[in-house]
Each structure stands twice: as structure tokens, then as C-alpha cells.
């Protein structure tokens, strides 16, 4: 089986290094195509009509000066040019959970979606952290992913119910793992929570006049009232697997308007 690894945290991120270690020896070919820098929250942006500089680190490794979706598509194109597209794309391992309202913003899930859009089975993997971003390089932040991810990927590949019919998003807890649960993503209250301080505002005076610079803090999903949602189950210590499809339709509202026609 030929597999492509990608992410949104960047080619040289710790999560990519962990993912490489996890899949080592389990696939016939492993390719890597990932952004040159951290592209967290880049969502599904593609660099349309813009040349995308790509450095080759090896015959099967590409550092892409573009978005996560760019990286996935370029990796698939490179693999296809050798005679066969990948059998699987794995995006991650993201540093931080992707649950609830963070899902549409996630570059990790977007890279998987770019693969899924062109017919390649895709899995996105995210590792919850304990609230301190500086723990990125601490091995304990990744131990649950190291222990659990490959077994779960193998399970999905054997599962005829999935067979690449949707994106599979896996969130791994920071705390002791209580088991594996399948769940939808939480979207209870209609609003995103920005943990404070939500942004840092700086005024800058330069040669071209007065400017304002903003730096957004991490975005997290609000606490869900649904105990069976991805956010709640992750907080309870479960590895959460969420099937994600194409549709963004609000069917409840659509049904009401269709009833008036």
C-alpha cells in the first residue's frame, strides 16, 4: 500500500515526526508532502493561479510553500506521475484537537478533504494537548498517539463500512485513554469560543503610515451539552473518531423553507 503523509503544522513539525515513526514499516511506500511553515487554521484554501514553490527533500518528500490543501494535492499529483495515486492519505498528527466548531477551520482536516475530494481515502489525526502550547516538544504530549494511532488506522482500513466513503477524523486525548468512540462533531450553541485573550492588538507606525497588527489566540470549541459529542467524549478520555462528509446543509432550516414552496 502507498500512503501519503501531510499536515498543517509544517513539514518539520513534531507531529509529522511522530506520524512518520508510527507508520514506519507498515506500508510499502511512504511519501510526505507538507507545508513549509505552520498553516494552522488555514482551512481548505488552495493557491489558485499562483505558482507554488516546492522543495524536494528526497525522491518522495516535498516541502510545499503553500497551504495544507496545496500540499495534499501536490503530493497526490507527484505520486500519480509515478504510475499510481496513493491508496491512503493521512493528515497529521495535529498538535491540538480538531472537534466541534474548529473542524471547518482545521488545515489538518482540510488536507484530508482535498484528498477525499479527488477520490483518495483520507484520515485526519489530531492530538489533544493539556493547554500549554510549549508542551509541543514534550514526548508525553504524544505518547497516546504513538500507542494508539496505527492500530486504529489498520482497523479502519479493514472496515468495509468505511472503505474511503468519507473523511475519518481521529482525535486522541491527552489524558489516559478510556477506549474508542465514534461520534459526530458538536455544534450546540451556534458560536465559536475564543479563549482569552482572544487577540493581541498592536499599533505600528511605519513609513507608509499607521497600521494595526492583530494576533489571534488558539481557537477551541465551546463545551457541548451533548455528552455523546466529540468534544465531550474527548474530554472524558476517549479516542474519538468522527466521519466527515461533503454536505454543509442545515437540513432542519431547508425543510422549513421547502415546506413553504
From Swiss-Prot:
The keyword Protein biosynthesis does not apply. InterPro entries: SurE (IPR030048), SurE-like_Pase/nucleotidase (IPR002828), SurE-like_sf (IPR036523). One of its GO terms (cellular component) is cytoplasm. GO terms for molecular function: 5'-nucleotidase activity; metal ion binding; nucleotide binding. Pfam families: SurE (PF01975). It is an enzyme of class 3 (hydrolase). Its EC number is 3.1.3.5. It catalyses: a ribonucleoside 5'-phosphate + H2O = a ribonucleoside + phosphate. Belongs to the SurE nucleotidase family. This is 5'-nucleotidase SurE.
Amino acid at each position: 500500500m502507498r500512503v501519503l503523509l501531510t499536515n498543517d503544522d509544517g513539514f518539520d513539525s513534531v507531529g509529522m515526526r511522530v506520524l512518520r515513526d508510527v507508520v514506519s514499516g507498515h506500508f510499502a511506500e511512504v511519501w510526505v508532502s507538507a507545508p513549509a511553515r505552520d498553516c494552522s487554521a488555514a482551512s481548505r484554501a488552495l493557491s489558485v493561479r499562483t505558482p507554488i514553490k516546492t522543495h524536494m527533500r528526497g525522491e518522495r518528500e516535498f516541502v510545499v510553500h503553500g497551504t495544507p490543501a496545496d500540499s495534499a494535492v501536490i503530493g497526490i499529483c507527484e505520486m500519480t506521475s509515478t504510475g499510481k495515486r496513493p491508496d491512503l492519505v493521512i493528515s497529521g498528527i495535529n498538535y491540538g484537537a480538531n472537534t466541534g466548531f474548529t473542524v471547518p477551520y482545521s488545515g489538518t482536516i482540510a488536507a484530508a478533504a482535498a484528498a477525499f475530494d479527488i477520490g483518495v481515502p483520507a484520515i485526519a489525526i489530531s492530538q489533544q494537548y493539556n493547554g500549554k502550547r510549549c508542551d509541543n516538544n514534550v514526548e508525553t504530549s504524544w505518547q497516546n498517539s504513538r500507542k494508539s494511532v496505527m492500530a486504529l488506522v489498520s482497523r479502519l482500513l479493514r472496515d468495509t463500512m468505511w472503505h474511503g466513503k468519507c473523511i475519518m477524523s481521529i482525535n486522541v486525548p491527552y489524558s489516559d485513554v478510556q477506549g474508542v468512540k465514534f461520534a459526530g462533531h458538536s455544534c450546540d450553541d451556534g458560536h465559536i469560543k475564543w479563549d482569552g485573550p482572544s487577540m493581541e492588538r498592536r499599533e505600528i507606525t511605519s513609513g507608509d503610515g499607521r497600521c494595526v497588527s492583530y494576533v489571534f489566540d488558539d481557537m477551541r470549541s465551546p463545551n457541548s451539552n451533548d455528552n455523546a459529542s466529540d468534544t465531550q467524549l474527548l474530554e472524558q478520555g476517549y479516542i474519538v473518531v468522527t466521519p466527515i462528509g461533503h454536505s454543509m446543509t442545515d437540513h432542519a432550516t431547508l425543510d422549513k423553507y421547502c415546506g413553504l414552496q
